[in-house]
Structure formats: structure tokens, C-alpha cells
Amino acid sequence: MKIIIQRVNQASVSIEDDVVGSIEKGLVLLVGIAPEDTTEDIAYAVRKITSMRIFSDDEGKMNLSIQDIKGSVLSISQFTLFADTKKGNRPAFTGAADPVKANQFYDIFNQELANHVSVETGQFGADMQVSLINDGPVTIVLDTKNK
């Protein structure tokens, strides 16, 4: 799994001008699933995301987790994280899981995450418009292959 984690003050996702998910202070996650990902990768990612101390405490130090601040997550499926740009000018996405597995794992990931924090989602496979106000900005790349 590759997950882009962005700390935000607010974010929303729309499909055809209808808002389908929105959050206030929290995290936007762009989630990519690889063919070789397992449920252990999901557990690892959920543990890291919910425990990562990337929110400021009263002294301005990044010392609080998403759970500590009672923040929310906006989770967006993002197969393009596996773009291969080595040849030519059009990216190939053969490194992404097939849609059936990716959808299944994306759902499991969101369900596991929801056991710890409030989760809003986009719609798997849809053309979405994501709006967000970055906080910091703080942007972190989590790759479960680099445990």
C-alpha cells in the first residue's frame, strides 16, 4: 500500500457536484493498493496512521495523533500512486492492484480505520473532485513495503 497523508483544517470530496464526504480538522488519505498487499499491510497502515504524532500540542510541537485531537479522516482511493513513468510520456498503472482486489482492500482499510477514528470516503473508481485546506503543510508518504 502507498498512502499519501495530508494534515488538513478541512476537506471534502464531490462527485458530479454532490459532496459525498467532508471533514474538519484531520487527515486526507490518498490510498493506493498493490497486487501483493495483504491484510497485514492494512493493519500496519491503520496502526501507523492512527498513532502518528503529526498534530501540534500546546507548545507547537508535533506531538499529538489523530486520535488525540479527535480528528477525522477523509479517505480517497488513488490507483495513480502506482504510476510507472519510466517509458514514454503516458504513465502505466500496472503496479496497482486489479479493481476487484483494490476495492475490497480499500473497504477493509476504511472499516479498520473507522474502529479508531471517524472516516469519510469518496467512491471507489469514481471521478472525484477533492478540495482541502492543508495545515502546515504536512504531507507524509507511507509505503507498507518499507516497514
UniProtKB/Swiss-Prot annotation:
Keywords attached to this entry: Cytoplasm, Hydrolase, RNA-binding, tRNA-binding
Catalytic reactions of this protein: glycyl-tRNA(Ala) + H2O = tRNA(Ala) + glycine + H(+); a D-aminoacyl-tRNA + H2O = a tRNA + a D-alpha-amino acid + H(+)
Gene Ontology BP term (one): D-amino acid catabolic process
Listed GO MF terms: D-tyrosyl-tRNA(Tyr) deacylase activity; Gly-tRNA(Ala) deacylase activity; Ser(Gly)-tRNA(Ala) hydrolase activity; tRNA binding
Classification via InterPro entries: Daa-tRNA_deacyls_DTD, DTD-like_sf
Motif (Gly-cisPro motif, important for rejection of L-amino acids): 136-137
Compartment(s) of residence: Cytoplasm
Enzyme class: hydrolase
Purpose of the protein: An aminoacyl-tRNA editing enzyme that deacylates mischarged D-aminoacyl-tRNAs. Also deacylates mischarged glycyl-tRNA(Ala), protecting cells against glycine mischarging by AlaRS. Acts via tRNA-based rather than protein-based catalysis; rejects L-amino acids rather than detecting D-amino acids in the active site. By recycling D-aminoacyl-tRNA to D-amino acids and free tRNA molecules, this enzyme counteracts the toxicity associated with the formation of D-aminoacyl-tRNA entities in vivo and helps enforce protein L-homochirality.
Matches recorded under PANTHER family: D-AMINOACYL-TRNA DEACYLASE 1, D-TYROSYL-TRNA TYR DEACYLASE
Domain notes from UniProt: A Gly-cisPro motif from one monomer fits into the active site of the other monomer to allow specific chiral rejection of L-amino acids.
NCBIfam families reported in the protein's UniProt record: D-aminoacyl-tRNA deacylase
Name of the protein: D-aminoacyl-tRNA deacylase
Organismal lineage: Bacteria, Bacillati, Bacillota, Bacilli, Lactobacillales
Gene for this chain: dtd
